UniProtKB/Swiss-Prot annotation:
One of its GO terms (cellular component) is chromosome. Belongs to the type IB topoisomerase family. It is an enzyme of class 5 (isomerase). The record marks W412, K444, T502, K528, N570, H632, K650 as: Interaction with DNA. Residues 433-790 form the Topo IB-type catalytic domain. Residues 426-427, 490-495, 581-583 are annotated as: Interaction with DNA. Its main location: nucleus. The gene is TOP1. The keyword Transmembrane helix does not apply. It is found in: Nucleus. This is DNA topoisomerase 1. Eukaryotic topoisomerase I and II can relax both negative and positive supercoils, whereas prokaryotic enzymes relax only negative supercoils. Releases the supercoiling and torsional tension of DNA introduced during the DNA replication and transcription by transiently cleaving and rejoining one strand of the DNA duplex. Introduces a single-strand break via transesterification at a target site in duplex DNA. The scissile phosphodiester is attacked by the catalytic tyrosine of the enzyme, resulting in the formation of a DNA-(3'-phosphotyrosyl)-enzyme intermediate and the expulsion of a 5'-OH DNA strand. The free DNA strand then rotates around the intact phosphodiester bond on the opposing strand, thus removing DNA supercoils.
């Protein structure tokens, strides 16, 4: 049949238009790509699929969120296109809009993005009809262990025992994963990936990228959030002007929060004490007998707290287990799992509401703190759940959730306004070990790896050429980019008056940077979490001259970069590389530093031939260099001095034992009995006259015994020397790392594949580097080949 030429032309034109449109959309997405700080999980993972051109995952029509205009159910609310991310923290974190407010992998959305004008706010009725509950045969129940799952699950108790730095995991299968075609290794190497509990990661990645309604048409199911138990008064009275004072439970709770910190350095800081009293006075009331903090004596409460701590230390394992079971572990198990796509059972990362540490942190850092309000006294929690899933019952009978959403464009399960800072929000997300989070984390490090293809061009042309630019704005952008690249500074954001006075690169004040000729810059400011950043660095002469110009004619409290903010800087960075932000720089510099250090000849020589403990020390020193670059500090613990004393005592004790063993060896070599028996008791001198008849037998026995004893003593000497060397090494490492926090960079900035590959190359069990939580978080990295380079 002959085709119509007109129709052919129309089809060809339509094809060209579609191809051009898809190309523009792809370019638009590339230009708008941002770091983990700025884009939601739904955008990063499924934007391609939603736009119809993803070759990774195909999504059916049933992935779209139900329209509020067509649904017969009044409580259905169409979710906004929120810019919300999956949190990497296991604790509930405020979603601050500033870059340095969190060290997690993601930030939180603005308040204006949370509401959709087209949404109708319908609260859940106080009593839900029974017939609204789904049939057990159709819906997966989180409280039942038989809920569908695509992997073997551990109990809550096993999952939560992940805090040790060096957990022993022995029940792992041994199976080499190193490709023979890529690496030939005669020596059998331990399989790092085999030391992780079996997680079918390849299958987990098939979980649909939207949460509310999955590929199979099954909804997201979870049980909401859990509240901490109400405060139980202990009844211990504090003193005011040496007289006992009666306090209400609420007053006592805040007083106890303060009292338990009596022996910390914060008690010497006037601002901390002022913030506490400002908060406490609001609860005490104007007419309360307590009027000033100087006359307060919290010692009785502190001593009570210390006694309680000591009691817990003295408890047996069974007693501790009984107490733990008394905290309603079954109830906790109910909240710690969510079912995604009706088949994948994922752990929820942060399902508890409220902590005392939030309040204590506000006293440390905030300009205008306030004691935490009870979120659940006025239910202020919004739940996001599948359309057909059963709505979780509010924890308080008779109450209702603030709002029920069925939003498939976001990844949070619940959120509420931060009770301390109402401008910020707290979210409940899936755990860091979930398959969705694993995919996001992997993509974060892949983005940072791409920077190595751009970095030389960025340094040579993108900012170096603008150091002496006549355009002041260009010059400020160039210098700020240089500082972010070379010093791994955070970008920084503007703060409200009631927020902590912390700064980043873009918010540096004139007083934060001093110039010392010929080209030294001295930095001194409070960074994230109010950690002080102090550093003297030598910079390029043109950078030094530019900083002097930026400081000229300004007061100490004026902005150093007065023509620059974070949004302008990030917009410029995205022009240099798609998705480039200050955090990508920071992640790149941290990972590339570790990669180069563990590959350098010096560390390779130190690692060769050593035992596992020596190799771990080599890795820790490389990790330390990264932590210093990122300014990951910690205060010296109160117990540090006591630990060093105990180590010294043990070393001296071992040296005494070594001396005795060496004396024994000398006596054995001379044919004499040792000074002590094998049981450590003094050896009795032989009376030869008394045992004259048995002398010959004794001599024969002594000769045979001497050889055995010589070998035994020699072995003990070697073992004792090894113990002394290990303790000396532990002592040196503990002293060297006392002010450095290694964990933060390991969790957020170091590509785990670098560490896993290093462990494989040097026969180091991965458990020696990653604790149980990190093993679960980085399950996706365990199959990396040992020749991996960042």
């Amino acid at each position: 049949m002959k085709s119509n030429p007109g129709i052919t032309v129309i089809k060809q034109n339509a094809s060209n238009v579609m191809e051009k449109t898809l190309k523009e959309e792809g370019q638009s997405r590339s230009n708008s790509e941002d770091s983990d700080d700025d884009k939601p999980l739904s955008h990063k993972l499924s934007s391609g699929a939603l736009n119809g051109n993803s070759h990774h995952i195909r999504m059916g029509s049933n992935l779209s969120c139900p329209s509020p205009y067509t649904s017969p159910k009044p409580r259905i609310i169409k979710g906004p296109e929120d810019e919300m991310l999956l949190s990497s923290e296991l604790q509930l974190n405020a979603g601050a809009s500033n870059a340095e407010s969190s060290d997690s992998d993601e930030s939180k959305p603005l308040a204006s993005e949370l509401e959709d004008p087209s949404s109708s706010l319908n609260k859940r009725p106080l009593i839900q009809p029974k017939n609204s509950d789904p049939s057990p045969s159709k819906k997966a129940k989180l409280s039942e262990p038989s809920a569908p799952t695509n992997r073997k699950l551990k109990t809550a108790e096993q999952e939560e025992a992940a805090a040790d730095d060096d957990p022993s995991i022995s029940n792992r299968n041994k199976k080499s994963t190193t490709p023979a075609s890529k690496v030939s290794d005669k020596k059998k190497r331990p399989d790092v990936s085999a030391s992780v509990n079996k997680v079918d990661f390849s299958k987990s990645l098939k979980v649909p990228l939207v949460l509310v309604k999955g590929r199979n048409g099954q909804p997201l199911v979870h049980n909401g959030v859990i509240f901490p138990p109400l405060y139980k008064p202990h009844g211990v009275k504090m003193l005011y002007r040496e007289n006992p004072v009666d306090l209400t439970p609420e007053q006592e709770e805040v007083a106890t929060m303060f009292a338990v910190m009596l022996e910390t350095e914060y008690m010497t800081k006037p601002k901390f004490r002022e913030n506490f009293m400002s908060d406490w006075r609001k609860i005490l009331g104007e007419k309360h007998i307590i009027q000033n903090l100087e006359d307060c004596d919290f010692t009785p409460i502190y001593e009570w707290h210390q006694r309680e701590k000591e009691k817990k230390k003295q408890m047996s394992t069974d007693e501790k287990k009984a107490i733990k079971e008394g905290k309603d572990e079954t109830r906790k198990e109910k909240y710690m799992w969510a079912v995604v796509d009706g088949m994948s059972r994922e752990k929820v990362g942060n399902f508890r509401v409220g902590t005392t540490r939030v309040v204590q942190r506000s006293w440390r850092a905030s300009k205008d703190p306030q004691v935490k309000k009870n979120v659940y006294s006025q239910i202020d929690i919004t739940i996001n759940i599948g359309k057909d899933a059963p709505i979780p019952e509010p924890p308080i009978p008779g109450e209702r959730w603030k709002e029920i959403r069925h939003d498939n464009t976001v990844t949070w399960l619940a959120f509420w306004n931060d009770p301390i800072n109402p401008k910020e929000f707290k979210y409940v997300f899936l755990a860091a070990s979930s398959s969705l989070k694993g995919k996001v984390t992997r993509e974060k490090y892949e983005k940072s790896r791409k920077l190595k293809d751009y970095i030389e061009g960025i340094r040579a042309a993108a900012y170096t050429k603008d150091f002496a630019s006549k355009d002041s704005k260009k010059r400020q952008i160039a210098v700020a980019t240089y500082l972010i690249d070379k010093l791994a500074l955070r970008a920084g954001n503007e703060k409200d008056d009631d927020e902590a006075d912390t700064v980043g690169c873009c918010t540096l004040k004139v007083e934060n940077v001093e110039t010392k000729r010929p080209n030294i810059l001295k930095f001194d400011f409070l960074g994230k979490d109010s950690i002080r950043y102090q550093n003297e660095v030598e910079v390029e002469p043109r950078v030094f001259s530019a900083i002097e110009q930026f400081r000229s004619g300004k007061e100490g409290g004026d902005d150093l970069f007065d023509q620059l903010d974070t949004s302008k800087l990030n917009a410029h960075l995205k022009e240099l590389m798609p998705g480039l932000t200050a955090k990508v720089f920071r992640t790149y510099n941290a990972s590339i530093t570790l990669d180069e250090m563990v590959r350098c000849k010096l560390l390779s020589r130190e690692t060769k031939g050593g035992d596992v403990a020596e190799k771990v020390v080599v890795y820790q020193h490389a990790n330390k260099e990264v932590a210093i670059i990122c300014n990951h500090q910690r205060t010296v613990s109160k117990s540090h001095s006591a630990q060093m004393v105990r180590l010294n005592e043990k070393i001296e004790e071992l040296k005494g034992l070594l001396k005795e063993l060496q004396e024994d060896l000398t006596r054995v070599n001379k044919g004499k009995p040792p000074l002590k028996n094998s049981d450590g008791k003094p050896k009795r001198n032989l009376n030869l006259k008394r045992y004259k008849g048995k002398l010959l037998k004794l001599i024969q026995k002594l000769r045979k015994w001497s050889e055995t004893r010589r070998l035994s003593v020699t072995k003990k000497i070697a073992q004792t020397n090894t113990k002394i060397e290990k303790m000396e090494r532990d002592k040196e490492t503990k002293e060297d790392l006392k002010t450095v926090a290694l964990g933060t960079s390991k969790i957020n900035y170091l590509d785990p594949r670098i560490t896993v590959a290093w462990c494989k190359r040097h026969d180091v069990p991965i458990e020696k580097i990653f604790n149980k939580s990190l093993l679960a978080k980085f399950a996706w990295a365990m199959d990396v080949v040992l020749i991996f380079r960042f």
